[in-house]
Amino acid sequence: AAFIEYCGRIDGRIHLCGLSLGGILALNYTLDFPEKVKTLVLIGTPHKVPKIMFRIQNMIFRFLPESVFQNMAFNKRDTFLLGNSMKNLDFSDRVKDITCPALIICGKKDRANMKSARYLRQNMKNAKLKIIQNTGHVVNEENPQDLGRLLDKFYSGTGI
């Protein structure tokens, strides 16, 4: 709800970019408010959430100390609640409705999301897929230079 409220306060259309769970938020927002979204970038984002992944993730989160979450966008409790709220999401039948320009990015070694990246590219009308070499799921940490170049080209309209 806070994300929707925040985006709603912005005048005009917005550029959304999300990685992993953030990509799920961006995807969901784009589907619910297509008139507000100018462009969409999804990095390592699943189009449907594998329930087993969230079960394992939530088990791990329970045992992690609060200090692990200090540099994240959400504290431990909110991260856990966000994950639980997303565990039944499946955008398979809806992504075809996304018409804004979109860039799908996936690390070459991100086996968990490669199939989804290809699915999104095939089912979104104006999407392009870019694979970043020598990179797993955390593209922004593992290869920030290549990610930055892709984003710069996409947002500046100089071609992908």
What are these regions (language model features)?
Residues 1-17, 149:
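Active-site loop/oxyanion-hole signature of alpha/beta-hydrolase fold enzymes
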Residues 18-23:
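Conserved alpha/beta-hydrolase "nucleophile elbow" surrounding the catalytic nucleophile
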Residues 24-32, 37-67:
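Flexible "cap/lid" loop of the alpha/beta hydrolase fold
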Residues 66-93, 109:
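Hydrophobic, aromatic-rich cap/lid helix
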Residues 97-98, 104-106:
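Short beta-strand/loop motif that positions the catalytic acidic residue
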Residues 111-116:
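Conserved alpha/beta-hydrolase "acid-adjacent" motif
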Residues 117, 121-138:
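Catalytic histidine neighborhood in serine/cysteine hydrolases
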Residues 134-160:
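Catalytic active-site module of serine/aspartate enzymes centered on a nucleophile-bearing elbow/loop
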